[in-house]
Amino acid sequence: QDPYVKEAENLKKYFNAGHSDVADNGTLFLGILKNWKEESDRKIMQSQIVSFYFKLFKNFKDDQSIQKSVETIKEDMNVKFFNSNKKKRDDFEKLTNYSVTDLNVQRKAIHELIQVMAELSPAVKTGKRKRSQMLFRGRRASQ
């Protein structure tokens, strides 16, 4: 049994999360995860879910009675989601810690918006295919 299971059970007790009213109005995350089967789609959803948990855990960082549980689960998330890659985890936490109400963050985000949108565009990845087609046409024309 993974160490996080015992600690998650500990958190369930602490938050009284086993009570029947917790199931009211369905699940938060599990239904969404069921909707997505492709790995890349699931990773997008999982990143938002992991971000939520990191923010939740941050709210309880000073609560000594659950500190061990929170740290154990965060470490296990690091292994499972970030493949124990500290740089990836640090960058992820950096992104989740930006405050959308901070004027400097807002200004920088707007300044970078065009470049970020270009990175999101699948058209960026089609350049290689076009070159290959051009090379092929060039060879055929010279034969």
Curated annotation (Swiss-Prot):
Family: Belongs to the type II (or gamma) interferon family.
Modified sites of kind Pyrrolidone carboxylic acid: 1
Record's subcellular location: Secreted
Protein name according to UniProt: Interferon gamma
Record keywords, A-Z: Antiviral defense, Cytokine, Glycoprotein, Growth regulation, Pyrrolidone carboxylic acid, Secreted
SUPFAM superfamilies assigned: 4-helical cytokines
GO MF entry, a single one: cytokine activity
Species whose genome carries this gene: Pan troglodytes
UniProt GO cellular component terms: extracellular space
